């Protein structure tokens, strides 16, 4: 059943029809046999331990939370963050990307705060609730011959209609975006889920959106909303041709025709970027190679360190790929971009560049303390006149989750805020970069000076998450606040912290105590009071 809106787009209520019976029980037995014979249960699952461990129960709105300091008026709205939170125990392996999406929200109004946590009610979650157990294949299982067998079990469950893929099988656990009166929960293997924020801050899953049946492919977790035009730019990647499809969605929520883009083989493309004129795609050598998974006991996505990194720059309103320009830079992978803009003949991309990534690092079968990895801030330049490309390193150590004042999306901006990492997942601090300043050379660690204008250190045993910039009503780019979740492993307690984005002072503006711990997660978003009031949903 689809709920039609006046703009022609549709929200589809999710009502999967899984089935129990003899074939279901038989496949359960087969799966248990495969796991018993081929899976090493002694391997630790790091991302199901400590504060990575899920909180199984939802939390309805808890009002009047203790607030230390003050919550500025511009923070009236709802701060939301999504992340993996598996409701049921894994059958075998577990990758951090596998968990069911759970949104943690803090509703702020007139200096008071309310906390809520809700699962995104995906088709996948509803079906596993029907069975009372995990039934869908996990990324953490996709390694070696064991991975091939688990793929076959999944295919049999679908073919025999034990599982229903009518509404997709994604987790909606990666990121959030607000566009055309709708808060969307995203995961790049599925369509967006529409979430309504209620007056008391509660979160309600309404269903998936397919833009009046025009969306027939996956949808990136990192679409870009142009703050001037109100349009949203997005893409999807696939294991079958076309491997990449670009889309534009009007400010009124109308999805334009697809633009297939040719790349040589299926890859993982987690993010992209826009300028006022262009869209920038990243053909990076993180390849989908199931044969190598079986033969070489690798993850199903494996990185090829011998291939160049390719960047495609396409006029953002192009009707086809004929005008795309491809540029090459040294081998790398990129999870997240900060922003992009144009300077004369050049397109500039600010990004977090990673060398020799290994997705197996987040499969959980690793030591407690992961090796530091070189995910560093870079400036890349693509000359549209000469066809040349160059890059320059802007940070001395690992940073990720880059954020900006989103009023500058697609335009030249000065400041980038990011997270300081001591491993692939644990955030030890928040950092502020000034792109107008030169990076200090010879540094091996991040410290104030040069292009680093401030560092907010979380302290021993305290770890944070992606920090979202919320502007005050002012013309200055960095005159606002950063808001983020923090967990204290010393006490087991979590909070939301607000700091001054201009000064990066060690003294927080506000700390909101939360009723229980909040597991580490992925991306966050601040939904303004105005956006809450303009939600176009029932």
From Swiss-Prot:
In terms of domain of life, where is this protein from?
A: Eukaryota
Q: What induces it?
A: By drought stress.
Cofactor(s) recorded for this entry are:
Fe(2+)
Q: What is written in the cofactor note of this entry?
A: Binds 1 Fe(2+) ion per subunit.
Q: Where in the cell is it found?
A: Cytoplasm
Any keyword Iron? yes
The record ties this protein, via InterPro entries, to:
Carotenoid_Oase
- Enzyme nomenclature, EC number: 1.14.99.n4
Report the catalytic activity.
all-trans-zeaxanthin + 2 O2 = 4,9-dimethyldodeca-2,4,6,8,10-pentaenedial + 2 (3R)-hydroxy-beta-ionone
Gene ablation phenotype (knockout): Plants do not show any phenotype alteration, but leads to higher seed carotenoid content.
How the protein assembles, per its UniProt entry?
Answer: Homodimer.
State the protein's purpose. Cleaves a variety of carotenoids symmetrically at both the 9-10 and 9'-10' double bonds. Active on beta,beta-carotene, lutein, zeaxanthin, all-trans-violaxanthin, 9-cis-violaxanthin and 9'-cis-neoxanthin. With most substrates, the carotenoid is symmetrically cleaved. Probably not involved in abscisic acid biosynthesis.
Family classification: Belongs to the carotenoid oxygenase family.
User: Know the name of this protein?
Assistant: Carotenoid 9,10(9',10')-cleavage dioxygenase 1
Q: Whose protein is this, by species?
A: Arabidopsis thaliana (Mouse-ear cress)
What gene name does this entry carry? CCD1
């Amino acid at each position: 059943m689809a709920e039609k809106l006046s703009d022609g787009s549709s929200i589809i209520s999710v009502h999967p029809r899984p089935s129990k019976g003899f074939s279901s029980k038989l496949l359960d037995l087969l799966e248990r046999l495969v796991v018993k014979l081929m899976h090493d249960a002694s391997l630790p699952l790091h991302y199901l331990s400590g504060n990575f461990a899920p909180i199984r129960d939802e939390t309805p709105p808890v009002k009047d939370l203790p607030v230390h300091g003050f919550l500025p008026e511009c923070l009236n709205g709802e701060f939301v963050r999504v992340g993996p939170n598996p409701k049921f125990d894994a059958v075998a392996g577990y990758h951090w990307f596998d968990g069911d999406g759970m949104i943690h929200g803090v509703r702020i109004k007139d200096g008071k705060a309310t906390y809520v946590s809700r699962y995104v009610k995906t088709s996948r979650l509803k079906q596993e609730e029907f069975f009372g157990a995990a039934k869908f294949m996990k990324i953490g299982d996709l390694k070696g011959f064991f991975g091939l067998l688990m793929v076959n079990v999944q295919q049999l469950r679908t073919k025999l209609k034990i599982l229903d893929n009518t509404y997709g099988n994604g987790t909606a656990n990666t990121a959030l975006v607000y566009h055309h009166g709708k808060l969307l929960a995203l995961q790049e293997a599925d369509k967006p889920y529409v979430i309504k924020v209620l007056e008391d801050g509660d979160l309600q899953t309404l269903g998936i959106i397919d833009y009046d049946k025009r969306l027939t492919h996956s949808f990136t977790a990192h679409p870009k909303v142009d703050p001037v035009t109100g349009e949203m730019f997005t893409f999807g990647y696939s294991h079958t041709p076309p491997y990449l499809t670009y889309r534009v969605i009007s400010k009124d929520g109308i999805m334009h025709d697809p633009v297939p883009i040719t790349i040589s083989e299926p890859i993982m493309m987690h993010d992209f970027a826009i300028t006022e004129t262009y869209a920038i795609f990243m053909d990076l050598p993180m390849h989908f190679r199931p044969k190598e998974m079986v033969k070489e006991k690798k993850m199903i996505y494996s990185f090829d360190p011998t291939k160049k990194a390719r960047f495609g720059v396409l006029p953002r309103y192009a009707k086809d790929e004929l005008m795309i320009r491809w540029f090459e830079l040294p081998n790398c992978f990129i999870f997240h971009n900060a922003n992009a803009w144009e300077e004369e003949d050049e397109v500039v991309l600010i990004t977090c560049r990673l060398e020799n990534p290994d997705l197996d690092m987040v499969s959980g079968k690793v030591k407690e303390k992961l090796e530091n990895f070189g995910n560093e801030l870079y400036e890349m330049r693509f000359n549209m006149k000469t066809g040349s490309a160059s890059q320059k390193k802007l940070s001395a150590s690992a940073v990720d989750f880059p954020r900006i004042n989103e009023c500058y999306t697609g335009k030249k901006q000065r400041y980038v805020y990011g997270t300081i990492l001591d491993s692939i997942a644990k955030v030890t601090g928040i950092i502020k970069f000034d792109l107008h300043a030169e990076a200090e050379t010879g540094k091996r660690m991040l410290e104030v000076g040069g292009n680093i204008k401030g560092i907010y250190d979380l302290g021993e045993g305290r770890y944070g998450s992606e920090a979202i910039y919320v502007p005050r009503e002012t013309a200055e780019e960095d005159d606002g606040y950063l808001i983020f979740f923090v967990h204290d492993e010393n006490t087991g307690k979590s909070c939301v912290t607000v700091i001054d984005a201009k000064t990066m002072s060690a003294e927080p503006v506000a700390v909101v105590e939360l009723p229980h711990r909040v597991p580490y997660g992925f991306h966050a978003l601040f939904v303004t009071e105005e956006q809450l009031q303009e939600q176009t949903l029932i």
